[in-house]
Amino acid sequence: MPQVDPELFDRGQFQAELALKSSPIAAFKKAIRQFREVLDNRFNSGRDIRRLIEDRAWCVDQILQQAWQRFDWGDDADIALVAVGGYGRGELHPYSDVDLLILLDSEDQESFREPIEGFLTLLWDIGLEVGQSVRSVQQCAEEARADLTVITTLMECRTICGPDSLRQRMLRVTGSAHMWPSKEFFLAKRHEQQRRHAKYNDTEYNLEPNVKGSPGGLRDIQTILWMARRQFGSLNLHALVREGFLVESECSMLASSQEFLWRVRYALHMLAGRAEDRLLFDHQRSIARLFGYEDNDVKLAVERFMQKYYRVVMAISELNDLIIQHFEEVILPCEQPVQIQPLNSRFQLRDGYIEVTHPNVFKRTPFALLEIFVLMAQHPEIKGVRADTIRLLRDSRHLIDDEFRHDIRNTSLFIELFKSSQGIHRNLRRMNRYGILGRYLPEFGHIIGQMQHDLFHIYTVDAHTLNLIKHLRKLNRPEMAEKYPLASKIIDRLPKPELIYIAGLYHDIAKGRGGDHSELGAVDAEAFCQSHQLPLWDTQLVSWLVQNHLVMSTTAQRKDLSDPQVIFDFAQLVGDQTHLDYLYVLTVADINATNPTLWNSWRASLLRQLYTETKRALRRGLENPVDREEQIRQTQTAALDQLVRNGIDQDDAEQLWSQLGDDYFLRHTAGDVAWHTEAILQHPDDGTPLVLIKETTQREFESGSQIFIYAADQHDFFAVTVAAMDQLNLSIQDARIITSTSQFTLDTYIVLDADGDSIGNNPERIAEIREGLIDALKNPDDYPTIIQRRVPRQLKHFAFAPQVTISTDALRQVSVLEVIAPDRPGLLARIGGIFLDFDLSVQNAKIATLGERVEDVFYITDARNQPLADPDLCKRLQAALVEQLSQDNGRDTLPTRINF
């Protein structure tokens, strides 16, 4: 800390200003305002961050000393003002806690009550927010003994005013000889860190990480120092070098990482104007600019900044693991005789932890850099890696070069890991943590720490990739069969499970390069398989899976699975049952690893339907596609059987059906046809819309709720319906719209509640929805077409230009309008309003929300029930949609595309 810095605080000038005024408050406030402005300016000009946070603590010291001296504490008073916690370390960020301990010799506070109250009131009046406690030395001891947080806080303290002897006494009575011996303290702190990491999902890669508390954050560095201080009395990172727990290069890396996070935290506080340790989307772009990052053709500035952040915290996590493992070996020595169990000439187990048999193992036999992970997969009882061996792994990474990568011993070992019966994910994570995986596979090294700046992908590319492999492994567990019944069954019968893991490792390997990552990744996957001597069939399968890893999900969510042509086209792409099995399992794992909230019963049912229908098509043979007329006859016959049993006249049913057209029977099950028909025939002819609601029984819509609406067709039917559903907090997943020759509309919507669950059999909720829809459809002119609701905070930071594409489906005689746009409340109602303005009818719709973006497909016709054929009309429609969907967006529009 500086001895004196007049630009920050000029004691003489401050005293002079105090003397001129009757109240000290203005002078104190001016001094605080001045040093804050100076320090912020120094930060913006790039001054050393360590000096800045120490200078801020020094400035607060000066303010507190001046405030303390204004009160009469008596001669030789046994009272001291002590800085504790981060402030006690002499580190303060702009809005960090200023934690103070007013330390007394005895519990009798009465003689100091008045000056203490006056002192704290003055601090409040001048705007210095502090956290304070008033304790005697004995009270400190009692509370520290009972509370890990208290003892940790008191370990870092310094006297600001008053006799330092009180603090020294307090340190003696709270020392490890009296409480919290180093072993007990280490175990408690390690458990505390584990709980804290669990709070952040045990990953450094959260979308909005906490720079202080998340894994790899500042708290992880401080935890190491607290443990060291309790055991060795060491106070800083350099002391750990002297004690042999760090080497100089590791110490330098930790110090530079700490300084980077300090700069991020300082910027966060400055931008937020308050104590803010979460790296929120609100601030990520601003800090990226502040740190000098700029967008380029491949990556946004914010993505480059966050990749730097993630790589820094991953490095901290790696060293945190190493040092804590080292501490464990020193602080928790085994009370039993050391157990040595040889594994081979290169490795042995020492009390359950694997270690090298001599320090030159990796130098003499470089293949051991991979062998150690294979051994851990083969011996799941191994607890971990000993600290010295972790350091040797880190120090030997340079041995992995092109010659190493093409050595058949190494390629064989790497493939052997994928063939292990267990431990694949765990040891790939270890390889990544210790820097081996990215070194062995340089293409993987490029995606380490690479974020995708959206809400759909909540992990970095490398974390997502390893999570995918974790989910693949979970599918093998018996307890997962209930949640993933089909995937669990399929993965057990895959002929070569190692191929799905390799495909998983490579499926996103080309992210961030520009271009189609699926195609680029397929090339990388093929090269990997060839260099690892995989047979031709295996190589082609892995490459095909990488190239097509998105196709099944896209087909299930964006195409009409009741259309036989959709199933036929997908079956043609897949080609055989083996490819279908591998692709289905990979897709399930990919969705789960992308974002846990994406996997719900709705998406599960869509994928299951696509898998089942494709399996039938493959069994039937691609040369024998479904006969549409036969499918219609089967549906009508089965529906008629149900209706006749329920007392419905066959002629009445067939008369109604004659008005509906083929699409209706292709897009509904026999059960739903019977349900609709019976309700329509029994519905009074009084102009009131018929609204039916039930849990859907269709396989592709399992776990959704089906809303069927039958009413006289009207110009604004779709717009009013979707606006009403939006106001009823319903999320539309699918829309099937049929207009009869008698100008009645038969609309089927598959919906979920806004929270993603089905409506269920809640009579009150069903009545609310039915009444709301009937009222809206009976009074369309009174109904608001767009619901104005607040845009959630996170969505605001992922605005992008809407894309609108129009093409023609000649077979179905409809125009296909695809919309990709930022998700916003009332978005479907906005789109429906545009359709209304252009006199368009919606025949079908597929709705998909992916994080902050929607990818919706509408099958539309014009007023004559024909596809859109006028290019000028299409351009005006696109322009209107883009303008409407760009509101509150703030981004330029992207080029749109029209195909006829």
Curated annotation (Swiss-Prot):
Coiled-coil regions listed: none
Domain of life: Bacteria
Uridylyl-removing: annotated span: 343-705
Reaction it catalyzes: [protein-PII]-L-tyrosine + UTP = [protein-PII]-uridylyl-L-tyrosine + diphosphate; [protein-PII]-uridylyl-L-tyrosine + H2O = [protein-PII]-L-tyrosine + UMP + H(+)
Notes on how activity is controlled: Uridylyltransferase (UTase) activity is inhibited by glutamine, while glutamine activates uridylyl-removing (UR) activity.
TM helices/strands, residue ranges: none
EC number: 2.7.7.59, 3.1.4.-
Annotated family: Belongs to the GlnD family.
The protein, known as: Bifunctional uridylyltransferase/uridylyl-removing enzyme
Species of the source: Pseudomonas aeruginosa (strain LESB58)
